[in-house]
Amino acid sequence: MIGNARMSQKYPTSSSRKRSPLSSGKYSAIGLLAYCRPGFEAECAQELQNIASLQFVYGYSKIDKGTGVVFWRCSQGNPLDVYKEIEVSRCIFARQVFCALHDIEIEDTTDRVSPVVEALRPGGAFGFLHIETPLEDEAGSLQKLAKKLTAPMSAALRNAGVLSKAKTDELPQLHLVCLSGQHIIAALAVHPNSSALPLGIPRLRFRNEAPSRSALKIEEAFLTMLTPAEREFVLKRGQRGVDLGAAPGGWTWYMVTQGVKMTAVDHGALQQELLEDPAVTYVSDDGYVYKPQRKVDWVVCDIVDKPKRTMERMADWLCYDWTTYALFNLKLPMKTRMDEVEACLQRLQERLLGADIESEVRVKQLYHDREEVTVLALTGHFLTAFQKH
């Protein structure tokens, strides 16, 4: 936190939450396991290392490019200390993070259960078992293996006292991650350090009346970047908003479904049904030039352009008090993606500080994002309603 601009920390901690299930047993960790968008493994690995460095814990990452999996192996310090300070919803590139306990190589594929039980027997207990794979193969063999292992593995772990007889949130969850038929990583998870969503992915249903699939992107942003209470506070019926670069109207359509009256700004064509909607005002203009006639509650923007240009325009909207909240995407270059994100956030922070605007800024690469990240900027009464320390 710098000055009086309350930007959310790059890697916010979870130390203020209630007593963690991790205090219920003894767990020995070897590192962190994270899932991210395939192709962004290097950025995710850098993010994990940055988080660990804040706790004076160090290690190295094992990356298989294109898999969306990062295994960060600790070489100095306790990775459990790092995991306790992670809140995955505040990570940028990691969509799921576990605390890795054991890296298990299966020598005899006729018995995958015994090596796992033997590795876990000396440690703490778990309240629930998930067997999963983040990897996709054409035959779905790993998914089938995970399903096949669940019943015998659960029974064996219960008999060994590793898994509780009944599901409980009082203990961490055990995740057995199948990276191949002979390679399993045993990891623990507690919420909100880890995502409660399978593989960290929200399962959203595309509605045929939506103008484009980008509607899923903005829906995911509101569902995952805000808590239910926060969402209820900032997104209300009767609000007014502006969608810059709106065509064909996916983001405008979603905001209208939430009861927000929208001004859709674009030289391109809007979906005909939206043009006829009384809650939508269409303005044929450049999204980077348009100025509102009066302050609105929301500005949203998904324009494909250089990230610094988008960020500067969004900073204008916030600093000139044209809007209370902003949700926008930054399209990232093929190289130096982490550097680009950090540079944009630093510049936004400078602009907000210069305008003496207190804010909270959250950044996330969503499942429905591509070569981009989504930024949520919150100002006004939100900051007093949801004090963060």
Curated annotation (Swiss-Prot):
GO molecular function: S-adenosylmethionine-dependent methyltransferase activity
Positions bound to S-adenosyl-L-methionine: 214, 247-250, 266, 286, 302
Entries under InterPro entries matching the protein: RlmM_FDX, RlmM_THUMP-like, RNA_MeTrfase_FtsJ_dom, rRNA_MeTrfase_M, SAM-dependent_MTases_sf
EC number: 2.1.1.186
Reaction catalysis annotation: cytidine(2498) in 23S rRNA + S-adenosyl-L-methionine = 2'-O-methylcytidine(2498) in 23S rRNA + S-adenosyl-L-homocysteine + H(+)
Principal location: cytoplasm
Enzyme class per UniProt: transferase
Pfam families named among the record's database cross-references: FtsJ, RlmM_FDX, RLMM_N
Single GO cellular component term: cytoplasm
Family: Belongs to the class I-like SAM-binding methyltransferase superfamily. RNA methyltransferase RlmE family. RlmM subfamily.
Protein's recorded name: Ribosomal RNA large subunit methyltransferase M
Taxonomic source organism: Hahella chejuensis (strain KCTC 2396)
The organism's taxonomic lineage, starting at the top: Bacteria, Pseudomonadati, Pseudomonadota, Gammaproteobacteria, Oceanospirillales
Gene that encodes it: rlmM
